[in-house]
């Protein structure tokens, strides 16, 4: 952090370099749970780089900060602008977060479930994975049947995989794949299940079976092309 601050304070340094350092320093402040310092730096970059990729990136970070803090209205105001960003990746990220907020503040108008979920996502950003998993378990207990349930299970499975709990990740994903009411994340869960079997558990036959399920059950899924490629490779087609 000291080195980044020195770059920012140096005279005659290229403005782009300074602002990139500010964004990185803002991220580090957020990792240290100092959001006010982070948003100050992001806002400076937003102001100096209006209508540019770096400025959009800073605005997206400010939107996430507002989301983490449970201020969904402010987050949405940032995201509405970013959805029109010229950078496709930023526009897509903004759209995803915007939809998450919209979808989960309709029935739960106070956004209590989403606030709990956002707090967990901040823990994930800070790499506090055991605390994040515990937070997800608490969310499932406090808000049974909440529209966020599938998102919660899916994120929990991802974190279990990252911490090496492959059996736990498989069991969690099966909560989604075995639920006939689950729809939006069903193909995501099935594809991740197949990857865990292939890459972590090393059960190639099971992975092949699951990739085939992705192809057959979800022909319109974004994962079909990759699932077909992996299925053929596991089958020994030499693709």
Predicted regions and their residues:
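Acidic, polar-rich low-complexity tracts and alpha-helical solenoid repeat scaffolds
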Residues: 1-239
